[in-house]
């Protein structure tokens, strides 16, 4: 392969407001497997990851901790690097948006865009979601909340700079049409097209209300808004706009940006629009993968449903966790993490299939041939079948990796491993060993098994980087044997094997599930206690003191007359039907009976409640609210349900007991 064959792959840069969890690890391990495989193919790879360290949330977290924002992120970034080291992540460069060279690049980019008229000063009036760091207009909100995360938004009114995203709407649509592989999976591309066609707004790219950010060089009271800062990392890390690195011409454009689906919009609309404005080449592909779910929802530290990858690696081994993430989750879709799935995958694939094949093969080689077997030609149909599977494996895995169907690549590898295990049962080496006349046939069988292990071991090196060398070692080979060009049957003439430790000891399922359940309960209890303490501290902090002591003026909503309040009709209603809407991930469509008639209510609570959780329950509604057309008039919502925000950013609903009649007035 020629020296100029390069491959540039990036993870999103992670927000270090707290330690990362297994969901973040999923993205990075997937990128690592792709990077390792490309290196095995002979590519000169640049694998970039890093941290996005500016913004309101970091500023607030640091203030709560009594340290500067830089001191706060320094501590978290150290844990991020430790985690990637633990998970055998082979990144080539780690960028921090607080690095001087990155800030220099961002300021040059911002200035260039301003001077050519693609950035202008204006006034932002709208809404801001702090957790998502996103700005929204009235029409984009869902039930008055952030359409991405469902949390409360804050009114924002400040002077700001804007990037002319709207200017590039037609070019973006043309990009998608002419480059159908630019956005993957296909469903995500359709979402982006719909978002643009509904009317693309210019993007706010500075904030005066946030102090922790890169200052606009010609107007320093304006720190840059997160996305211009964050997105530019993909080129600043290569030396664009700075003299720290000099790899831009070699590696840009990126071959693959891997991101979570929640930030795909910024990477496929704002980022290419910025690059168009800068007259720079566009990345070749952006892949928006799904979420790793637990207990039916996205992992969240505040809910207490996160999984610490460090604990998992300590208990089961790094490669077991890497394998689970890469094999279990359908790439591009959401996937579920459960303790049962993890243990069953380790036992069935790693301990039973792979581990048993290696241990049985090595043991038989030692028992029947003193540990040394040589190439002996196969003479039966099942030999040719196994040889064919071995010889065709690399092409299948390569196609899957190129298509980003990583679980399918592992399925192909393990199909050969499973076929080799079946081959043992079919050839019965222990029976062949009883007759000296079968010695050549016996050696041929064991050689076929060694070859199956060698070739699958080479390919597994991209996914299980500490296991593959162990496999080679037990086969009597060194690390140089992990050569993709040698993944053909017969490439290794002789094996001198020796027994080693079990690759993946089998786990007692019942015992382990009980242990993990206990640990889960402890973690949830700790999270609940922490949330309660946080809420109590916040309440105490905000509690009004006596006027003569504090002089604090607490602002409330304007008073209304008692007669006006009496006009609001509050009643108990029974949920008779409830379903998700195909058109919205946020809304539930409820059919409720208020004692007189059934009515339709649309409510933005789909993130926290499943339809089956609500059917048959009695809830409070505003019964005389004027009907409101929603979803472009397709539905009409005839009321509003009672719901409250929880301390952790969730949602709770007041349910009424059996002794409360449907239709009762709420006073």
Where are the predicted features?
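N-terminal catalytic cores of NTP/NDP-binding nucleotidyl/phosphoryl-transfer enzymes
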Residues: 2-76, 95-111, 115, 132, ...
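Structured secondary-structure scaffolds
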Residues: 2-49, 101-105, 149, 155-367, ...
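Cys/His-rich short segments
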Residues: 116-169, 173
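Secondary-structure transition/capping motifs at alpha-helix termini
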Residues: 1-3, 37-44, 65, 69, ...
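A glycine-rich helix N-cap at a beta->alpha junction
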Residues: 78-92
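Helix-rich, typically C-terminal accessory recognition domains appended to large enzymatic cores
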Residues: 121, 127, 328, 333, ...
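Phosphate-backbone binding interfaces of nucleic-acid-interacting proteins
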Residues: 540-667
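Intrinsic disorder at enzyme termini
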Residues: 468-564
């Amino acid at each position: 392969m020629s020296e100029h064959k390069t491959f540039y792959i990036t993870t999103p840069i992670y927000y270090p407001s707290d330690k990362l969890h297994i969901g973040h690890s999923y993205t990075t391990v997937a990128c690592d497997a792709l990077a390792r495989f490309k290196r095995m193919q002979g590519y000169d790879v640049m694998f970039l990851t890093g941290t996005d360290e500016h913004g309101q949330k970091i500023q607030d977290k640091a203030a709560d901790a009594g340290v500067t924002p830089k001191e706060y992120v320094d501590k978290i970034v150290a844990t991020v690097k430790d985690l990637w080291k633990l998970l055998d992540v082979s990144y080539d460069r780690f960028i921090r948006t607080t690095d001087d060279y990155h800030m220099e690049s961002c300021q040059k980019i911002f200035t260039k865009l301003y001077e050519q008229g693609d950035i202008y000063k204006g006034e932002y009036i709208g809404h801001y979601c702090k957790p998502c760091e996103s700005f929204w207009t009235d029409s984009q909100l869902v039930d008055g909340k952030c359409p991405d995360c469902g949390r409360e938004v804050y009114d924002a009114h400040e002077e700001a700079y804007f990037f002319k995203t709207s200017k590039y709407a037609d070019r973006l649509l043309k990009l998608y049409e002419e480059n159908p592989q630019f956005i993957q999976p296909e469903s995500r591309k359709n979402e982006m097209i719909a978002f643009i066609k509904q009317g693309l707004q210019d993007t706010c790219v500075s904030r005066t209300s946030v102090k922790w950010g890169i200052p606009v060089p010609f107007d320093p009271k304006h720190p840059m808004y997160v996305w211009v800062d964050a997105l530019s990392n993909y080129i600043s890390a290569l030396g664009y706009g700075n003299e720290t690195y000099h790899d831009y011409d070699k590696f840009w454009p990126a071959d693959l940006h891997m991101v979570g689906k929640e930030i795909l919009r910024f990477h496929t609309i704002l980022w290419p629009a910025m690059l168009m404005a800068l007259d720079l080449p566009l990345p070749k592909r952006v892949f928006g993968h799904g979420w790793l779910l637990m207990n039916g929802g996205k992992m969240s530290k505040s809910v207490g449903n996160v999984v610490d990858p460090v604990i998992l690696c300590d208990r089961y081994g790094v490669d077991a966790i890497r394998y689970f993430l890469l094999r279990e989750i359908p790439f591009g879709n959401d996937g579920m993490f459960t303790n049962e799935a993890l243990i069953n995958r380790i036992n069935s694939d790693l301990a039973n299939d792979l581990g048993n094949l290696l241990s049985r093969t090595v043991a038989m080689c030692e028992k029947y041939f003193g540990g040394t077997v040589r190439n002996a030609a196969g003479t039966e149909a099942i030999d040719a079948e196994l040889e064919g599977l071995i010889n065709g494996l690399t092409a299948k895995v390569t196609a899957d990796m190129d298509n980003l169907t990583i679980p399918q690549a592992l399925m192909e590898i393990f199909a050969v491993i499973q076929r080799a295990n079946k081959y043992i049962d079919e050839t019965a080496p222990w029976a062949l060993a009883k007759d000296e006349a079968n010695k050549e046939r016996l050696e041929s069988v064991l050689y076929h098994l060694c070859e199956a292990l060698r070739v699958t071991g080479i390919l597994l090196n991209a996914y299980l980087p500490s296991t593959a060398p162990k496999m080679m070692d037990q086969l009597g080979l060194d690390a140089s044997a992990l050569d993709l060009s040698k993944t053909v049957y017969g490439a290794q003439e002789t094996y001198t094997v020796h027994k080693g430790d079990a690759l993946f000891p089998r786990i007692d399922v019942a015992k382990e599930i009980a242990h993990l359940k206990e640990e889960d309960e402890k973690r949830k209890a700790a999270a609940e206690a922490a949330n309660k303490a946080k809420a109590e501290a916040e309440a105490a902090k905000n509690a009004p003191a006596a006027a003569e002591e504090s002089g604090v003026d607490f602002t409330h909503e304007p008073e209304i007359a008692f007669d006006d309040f009496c006009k609001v009709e509050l009643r108990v209603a029974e949920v008779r039907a409830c379903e998700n809407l195909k058109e919205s991930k946020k809304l539930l469509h409820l059919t409720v009976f208020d004692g007189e008639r059934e009515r339709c209510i649309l409510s933005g609570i789909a993130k926290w409640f499943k339809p089956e959780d609500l059917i048959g329950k009695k809830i409070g509604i505003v019964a005389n609210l004027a009907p409101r057309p929603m979803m472009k008039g397709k539905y009409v919502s005839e009321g509003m349900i009672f719901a409250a925000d929880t301390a952790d950013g969730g949602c709770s609903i007041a349910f009424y007991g059996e002794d409360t009649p449907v239709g009762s007035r709420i006073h």
